[in-house]
UniProtKB/Swiss-Prot annotation:
Involved in the biosynthesis of branched-chain amino acids (BCAA). Catalyzes an alkyl-migration followed by a ketol-acid reduction of (S)-2-acetolactate (S2AL) to yield (R)-2,3-dihydroxy-isovalerate. In the isomerase reaction, S2AL is rearranged via a Mg-dependent methyl migration to produce 3-hydroxy-3-methyl-2-ketobutyrate (HMKB). In the reductase reaction, this 2-ketoacid undergoes a metal-dependent reduction by NADPH to yield (R)-2,3-dihydroxy-isovalerate. Residues 183-328 form the KARI C-terminal knotted domain. Residues 2-182 form the KARI N-terminal Rossmann domain. One of its GO terms (biological process) is L-valine biosynthetic process. One of its GO terms (molecular function) is magnesium ion binding. This is Ketol-acid reductoisomerase (NADP(+)). Gene3D superfamilies: 6.10.240.10, NAD(P)-binding Rossmann-like Domain. Its EC number is 1.1.1.86. Signal peptide: none annotated. Keywords: Amino-acid biosynthesis, Branched-chain amino acid biosynthesis, Magnesium, Metal-binding, NADP, Oxidoreductase. NADP(+) binds at residues 25-28, 53, 83-86, 134.
Length: 332
């Protein structure tokens, strides 16, 4: 089992006298900047232009500056701009101002693992990957808790990169829950795999296909939505809170029997084989190459995919079901 690092295993000492530049002020950027500042660290916010994020940062009490100015004044640079933008920000706004002994920090390993960013050997490169969205990272921290995180070291020029990674994790609140050490390779490949075959791709497609099967068989769309999509939250919540065994204990005997038999029929060895093929594409770098090419063309697959989902019957029915659910929600 992996070692879990908690508060007592980490100290802010390795970074307490450092100036930290947070590049980006979106979901994760805002949470990181606020949590690091509230932990007593000196934080600068670096942005590409004076847009909405600039105004939000100002309203939060920061004095945002252009990215290159933040880099020039900092010891630690944290990349919290979108994955597909990072290499351009690094090349144009960060690399020209890097000094020996600086730190480059990432929340996801994509750009380092696939060599879209190749830092000089004279800087530390490490990662802290919170296992939750930015608003939750901030909310849990503000309430005295924390979201778990993964940490990894790619380059250890100073000999203290891991200690600094733990320090930032502590400042984010992650060590209040638990931090697990990984590698850039492992985090990147497992994260992409989970998104594609499970969280964003697999489960979404499974629910939509199940809905379509019922509707095509003549069942009312509203009933089909309840049975194949809406109730997913209840099952996932049970798994999150009690594990698979706890979830199974909470459902009926009929549901368990049907699940054990039909589940393995639908998600069979052929599906597992295809999952392995998806993993092979991720590990070989083919997915990254394809995604970069797609992005450079304006991401037509994303544009068309979003249009198809937005106009689908299940999305239309879902809006109606959510309205019904909201009407029945108790007033707080």
């Amino acid at each position: 089992m992996a070692k879990v690092y908690i508060d007592k295993d980490a100290s802010l000492d390795p970074i307490k006298d450092k100036t930290i530049a947070v590049l980006g002020y979106g979901s994760q950027g805002r949470a990181w900047a606020l949590n690091l500042r509230d932990s007593g660290l000196k934080v600068l916010v670096g942005l590409e232009r004076e847009g909405n994020s600039w105004k939000v940062a100002e309203s939060d009490g920061f004095n945002p500056m252009h990215t290159e100015d933040a880099v020039k004044k900092s010891d630690i640079v944290i990349f919290l701009v979108p994955d597909m933008v990072q290499r351009y920000v690094y090349r144009e706004r960060v690399a020209p101002y890097l000094r020996d002994g600086m730190d480059l920090v990432f929340a996801h390993g994509f750009n380092i693992h696939y060599k879209l960013i190749e830092p000089p050997k004279t800087v530390d490169v490490y990662m802290i990957a919170p296992k939750g969205p930015g608003p939750i990272v901030r909310e849990y921290f503000a309430k005295g808790g924390g979201v778990p995180a993964l940490v990894a070291v790619h380059q250890n020029y100073s000999g203290k990169a891991f200690e600094k990674a733990l320090a930032i994790a502590k400042a984010l609140g992650a060590t209040r829950a638990g931090v697990i050490e990984t590698t850039f390779k492992e985090e990147t490949e497992t994260d992409l795999f989970g998104e594609q075959v499970d969280l964003v791709g697999g489960i979404t497609q499974l629910m939509r296909t199940a809905f379509q099967v019922l509707v095509e068989a003549g069942y009312q769309p509203e009933i089909a939505y309840y049975e194949t999509i809406n109730e997913m939250k209840m099952i996932v919540d049970l798994i999150y809170e009690k594990g698979f065994t706890g979830m199974l204990k909470a459902v009926s005997e009929t549901a368990k029997y049907g699940g054990f038999t039909a589940g393995k029929y639908v998600i069979n060895e052929d599906v597992k084989k295809r999952m392995k093929e998806v993993l092979d594409r991720i590990r070989s770098g083919k997915f990254a190459e394809e995604w970069i090419e797609e992005y450079n063309k304006g991401a037509p697959t994303l544009v068309n995919g979003m249009k198809e989902v937005e106009n689908s019957l299940e999305e239309q029915v879902g809006r109606q079901i959510r309205e019904i659910s909201l009407r029945g929600k108790p007033k707080s």
